[in-house]
């Protein structure tokens, strides 16, 4: 055996020879079935009290401070809710106002009927009923349409 393996063998030997017993000793009276099942107490209560830590200061002092803080936060939220409600009501009142009447006699059409020089008569070129791609009427692309 080498020098490094000797401590491991001794540790294994000690662990094998150690007496095996209960993890938690039971009271001498034997106790009830529940104490045998849950020797460390009721798990429901343990789970609910796990985060609770005791502090040196009185709880009434901290409760008064937290109550004041809660009241301040409540008042702030109440004011914010009032402001939001006022904004919503103002927006609804603005939307429900009737539109202002406009003068109907002075309206100008959105297009000028006299300026029709920008419109081209595309149907007179080429054969009727024949469709072509946009821009295909340029010279060089479709020679039969360019002849007239």
Curated annotation (Swiss-Prot):
Family label: Belongs to the bombesin/neuromedin-B/ranatensin family.
Superkingdom classification of source: Eukaryota
Main location: secreted
One GO location term (cellular component): extracellular space
Keywords, in A-Z order: Amidation, Cell projection, Cleavage on pair of basic residues, Cytoplasmic vesicle, Mast cell degranulation, Secreted, Signal
Residues cleaved off as propeptide: 54-148
Biological processes, Gene Ontology terms: mast cell degranulation; negative regulation of voltage-gated potassium channel activity; negative regulation of voltage-gated sodium channel activity; neuropeptide signaling pathway; positive regulation of behavioral fear response; positive regulation of peptide hormone secretion; positive regulation of phospholipase C-activating G protein-coupled receptor signaling pathway; positive regulation of respiratory gaseous exchange
Pfam families cross-referenced by the UniProt entry: Bombesin
Annotated gene: GRP
Protein name: Gastrin-releasing peptide
Methionine amide carried by residues: 50
Signal peptide: 1-23
């Amino acid at each position: 055996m080498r020098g490094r393996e000797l401590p491991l063998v001794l540790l294994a030997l000690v662990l094998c020879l150690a007496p095996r017993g209960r993890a938690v000793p039971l009271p001498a009276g034997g106790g009830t079935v529940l104490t045998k099942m849950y020797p460390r107490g009721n798990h429901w209560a343990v789970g609910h009290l796990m985060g609770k830590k005791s502090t040196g200061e009185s709880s009434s002092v901290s409760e008064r401070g937290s109550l004041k803080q809660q009241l301040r936060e409540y008042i702030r939220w109440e004011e914010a809710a009032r402001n939001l409600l006022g904004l919503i009501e103002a927006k609804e009142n603005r939307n429900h106002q009737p539109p202002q009447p406009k003068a109907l006699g002075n309206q100008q059409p959105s297009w000028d009927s006299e300026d029709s020089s920008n419109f081209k008569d595309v149907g007179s070129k080429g054969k009727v009923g024949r469709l072509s791609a946009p821009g295909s009427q340029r010279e060089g692309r479709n020679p039969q349409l360019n002849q007239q």
